[in-house]
Amino acid sequence: MSNSMTKLTELREMSDEQLDATAKEAAETLFRLRFQSQSERLNTPSEIKKNRKTIARVKTIQTERQLAQPQA
């Protein structure tokens, strides 16, 4: 995922596997940014917030999909 802030409509069109990959990639990027922010100055501090929001969006969509499935 090249764009760190993915639109909600784009995320909703993704499969479950793609959502998992997107969340994992955003979490790894967030980890690197946090580590970098402690050791040196970030060029774009807003990237931390964008990655956190992307992770939250993915988790929200995953929860919506789980709740939409019929209980078996």
Swiss-Prot record:
Record GO biological process: translation
SUPFAM superfamilies: Ribosomal protein L29 (L29p) (SSF46561)
GO MF entries: structural constituent of ribosome
Domain of life assignment: Bacteria
Gene Ontology CC terms, in alphabetical order: cytosolic large ribosomal subunit
Disulfide cysteine pairs (residue numbers): none
Keyword terms, alphabetized: Ribonucleoprotein, Ribosomal protein
Keyword Magnesium recorded: no
Coiled coil (residue ranges): none
Similarity comment: Belongs to the universal ribosomal protein uL29 family.
PANTHER family for this protein: 60S RIBOSOMAL PROTEIN L35/50S RIBOSOMAL PROTEIN L29, LARGE RIBOSOMAL SUBUNIT PROTEIN UL29C
The protein, known as: Large ribosomal subunit protein uL29
